[in-house]
Swiss-Prot record:
Quaternary data: Homodimer.
CDD domains according to UniProt: ProRS-INS, ProRS_anticodon_short, ProRS_core_prok
One GO molecular-function entry: transferase activity
GO CC annotation terms, alphabetical: cytosol
Function field: Catalyzes the attachment of proline to tRNA(Pro) in a two-step reaction: proline is first activated by ATP to form Pro-AMP and then transferred to the acceptor end of tRNA(Pro). As ProRS can inadvertently accommodate and process non-cognate amino acids such as alanine and cysteine, to avoid such errors it has two additional distinct editing activities against alanine. One activity is designated as 'pretransfer' editing and involves the tRNA(Pro)-independent hydrolysis of activated Ala-AMP.
Protein name: Proline--tRNA ligase
HAMAP family for this protein: Pro_tRNA_synth_type1
Location(s), subcellular: Cytoplasm
Length: 566
């Protein structure tokens, strides 16, 4: 395709708000254009890359007998009410009404729709297992869209759903999909690591995320250097090893702590280590108030809290609720009170004697509070995030951290949706049973960004040849010169028989063409320049920068060999 006919609006400068490298490069190379916050148009080069990614996804889905369908993006509220997610999903769900006042959602996922389809049509165990997938735009009302395609309000996903009669069948499909995802990410040129993860709003009992390693990743991966252990930090278990207490109990003492609002401020004010301070937080669980304690240098993990209590309906109490309950604002709270409020504490609170807690009076704290003497803890548990260097739960050594971008996730949903939506089948005894389900997603547009995050240099993108928008970049330095233009036209005709060729025939300066070529990042560049009269062209690899002068008589064989070795 001639570049003069292709819409590739490259940029010299990118908007200041483009934080992620992939966002800057995709804008600068003319692949995407922002419509509004979190919403982008995919321009010709991006559309070609997306097509290539989707082709690989389809090949791998068909390899494991997944069947492609296409479901509506507009979903009626009644289906979501059946599953219970209409009220539970939260403000990220884009809701709207038609002219008759009927409520709908723009689908972030399709569990409800696909379950309704299958329950109406699938009747017998003889029709199982069944795996359906689609590639479609999804919608999520992100509070703060950022990083370009990595966290947007409209995005492209491949989502698949499997249906089973028994656990063994679900396990087999889960493993097939897990393996297929590994192949997909390898083929598209991403270093993606599977990690144990939380199932979030989708639900289910077992899940892995595939994380593309990146400095701007919004998720932290906890991993071992001695084993294959890897988990999202939300799921990484903290191993508790009791430390014997040696301090004598000291008298409980109330002190004034004016204008102190955080654990760090309190530690500085008292000249104490942060790990000797206790943070007290009040939550509402299904309408009931509880207090949760963690040490000052630890961060509470609400995902673990939800897992411990077996509900997603957990939220921090508001300041007004806390004041009405305990008589003080956050920053002065503690477990020493005579209220009927259950207290839960992270395991490592057990290691402390004579701890510092809020006095439940603004501007005051208590020194030397002790469990069993001054307050009781109803239960201890793992309620916090692991710290780098702490021992891992598999015993393989210290925790190491890396940042990652989630590009895929696989779930075992079990009967979460089939039971709530009455999706059953008849087993071999003729008895109705709820369908077992799996759910599997790949962020196709996220994958586009992740590829760019991992494949670039200071000059631009370096496309893996499996997804590149064009195979070769043919450049004529000066198309006004007959020898260059005629040779370039001849080579274009020859090369496009076996390759997708982007032919830069524009009447631009050589520097502009070379800068754009580096920025766009096609795997191989063929330059027709000053030696055209002698039949000599320059062939250059984008990834290594290696170049060679080649006679046109040998060009096809040279390019074939070069391309096969990339």
């Amino acid at each position: 395709m001639k570049q003069s006919k292709v819409f590739i609006p490259t940029m010299k400068e990118v908007p200041a708000g483009a934080e992620a490298l992939s966002h800057r490069l995709l804008l600068k190379a003319g692949l995407i254009k922002q419509s509004t916050s979190g919403i982008y148009s995919y321009l010709p080069l991006a559309a070609r890359v997306l097509n290539n990614i989707e082709a690989i996804v389809r090949e791998e889905m068909e390899r494991i007998d997944a069947v492609e369908i296409l479901m509506p993006a507009l979903q009626q509220a009644e289906l979501w009410e059946e599953s219970g997610r209409w009220s539970a999903y939260g403000p990220e769900l884009m809701r709207l009404q038609d002219r008759n006042g009927r409520e709908f959602a723009l689908g972030p996922t399709h569990e409800e729709v696909v379950t309704s389809i299958v329950r109406d049509e699938l009747k017998s165990y003889k029709q199982l297992p069944l795996t359906l997938f689609q590639i479609q735009s999804k919608y999520r009302d992100e509070k703060r869209p950022r990083f370009g395609l990595l966290r947007g309000r409209e995005f492209i996903m491949k989502d698949a759903y499997s249906f089973h009669a028994d656990e063994d069948s679900l396990d087999a499909s889960y493993q097939d999909m897990y393996n297929a995802y590994g192949r997909i990410f390898k083929r598209v040129g991403i270093n993606a690591r599977p990690v144990v993860a939380d199932s979030g709003a989708i639900g289910g009992s077992h899940t892995h995320e595939f994380m593309a390693l990146s400095e701007i990743g919004e998720d932290t991966i906890v991993y071992s250097e001695q084993s294959d252990y890897a988990a999202n930090i939300e799921k990484a278990e903290v191993v508790y090893q009791a430390n014997e207490k040696h301090e004598d109990l000291q008298p409980l003492t109330k002190i004034e702590t004016p204008n102190i609002h955080t654990a760090q401020e309190l530690a500085t004010f008292l000249d104490k280590p942060l790990d000797e301070i206790t943070k007290s937080m009040v939550f509402k669980i299904d309408g009931e108030f509880i207090m949760v304690l963690v040490r000052g240098h630890h961060e509470l993990n609400d995902i673990k809290l939800k897992a411990y209590f077996g509900t997603d309906n957990i939220e921090l109490a508001s300041e007004d609720e806390i004041v009405n309950l305990l008589g003080a604002k956050p920053g002065s709270l503690g477990p020493v009170f005579d209220k009927e409020i259950k207290v839960y504490a992270d395991n490592f609170i057990q290691d402390l004697n004579n701890i510092v807690v809020g006095a439940n009076e603004d501007g005051y704290h208590l020194l030397n509070a002790n469990i069993g003497r001054d307050f009781e803890v109803d239960a201890f548990g793992d309620f916090r995030f692991i710290l780098e260097g702490e021992p891992l739960s598999d015993g393989s050594g210290p925790a190491r951290f890396a940042e990652g971008i989630e590009v895929g996730q696989v779930f075992k949903l079990g009967t979460k949706y089939s039971e709530s939506m009455n999706a059953t089948f008849l087993d071999n005894q003729g008895k109705a049973q709820p369908l077992l389900m799996g759910c599997y997603g790949i962020g196709v547009s996220r994958t586009l960004s992740a590829i760019v995050e991992q494949n670039n240099d200071e000059n631009g993108i370096i496309w893996p040849k499996s997804v590149t928008p064009f195979d070769l970049h043919l450049i004529t330095i000066n198309p006004k010169k007959d020898d260059q233009r005629e040779l370039a036209d001849q080579l274009y005709t020859q090369l496009k028989e076996n390759y997708d060729v982007l032919y830069d025939d524009r009447k631009e300066r050589a520097g502009v063409k070379f800068n754009d070529a580096d920025l766009i990042g096609l795997p191989v560049r063929v330059v027709v320049g000053k030696n055209a009269a002698e039949g000599i062209v320059e062939v250059k690899r984008r990834d290594t920068g290696e170049s060679e002068d080649v006679h046109v008589d040998n060009l096809i064989n040279y390019v074939n060999t070069l391309y096969s070795n990339i």
